[in-house]
């Protein structure tokens, strides 16, 4: 298992969020998730301006193995999407915590962050899934 950056928060469904200034939340999927999915072949991104509620489907990724919904970790408005993924979905496989980010959400309820998993808690979820 790769190192999990300490500045991230997670959903049990393997999405991560990195909080920046001005209530901006960058969202992607974990290294564990991209490993499970295998080689990604398609990413359906949300539209800029879309309103997302925490826990609802925000995007869809498809691999050679399966399609998987990506859930929004926070409530807010999509203000940016990673258009690189349209042509190079494998960027998520190559750099899930960096260049493989999926979208940026302007959070409307920053307090939701406290409901998300810390890197240590997420690691425990992964370890319990393996047994």
From Swiss-Prot:
The glycine cleavage system is composed of four proteins: P, T, L and H. Disulfide bonds: none annotated. Gene3D superfamilies: 2.40.50.100. This is Glycine cleavage system H protein. Binds 1 lipoyl cofactor covalently. The lineage of its organism: Bacteria, Pseudomonadati, Pseudomonadota, Gammaproteobacteria, Lysobacterales. Keywords: Lipoyl. NCBIfam families: gcvH, PRK01202.1. Belongs to the GcvH family. The glycine cleavage system catalyzes the degradation of glycine. The H protein shuttles the methylamine group of glycine from the P protein to the T protein. One of its GO terms (biological process) is glycine decarboxylation via glycine cleavage system. Residues 24-106 form the Lipoyl-binding domain. One of its GO terms (cellular component) is cytosol.
């Amino acid at each position: 298992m790769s190192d999990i950056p300490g500045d991230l928060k997670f959903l049990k469904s393997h999405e991560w969020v990195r909080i920046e200034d001005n209530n901006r939340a960058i969202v992607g999927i974990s290294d564990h998730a991209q490993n499970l999915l295998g080689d990604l072949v398609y990413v359906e991104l949300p539209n800029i301006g879309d309103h997302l509620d925490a826990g609802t489907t925000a995007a869809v990724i498809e691999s050679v193995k399966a399609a998987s919904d990506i859930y929004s970790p926070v409530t807010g408005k999509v203000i940016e999407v990673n258009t690189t993924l349209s042509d190079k979905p494998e960027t998520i496989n190559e750099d899930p915590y960096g260049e493989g980010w999926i979208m940026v959400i302007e959070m409307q309820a920053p307090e939701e962050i406290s409901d998300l998993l810390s890197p240590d808690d997420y690691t425990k979820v992964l370890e319990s899934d393996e047994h």
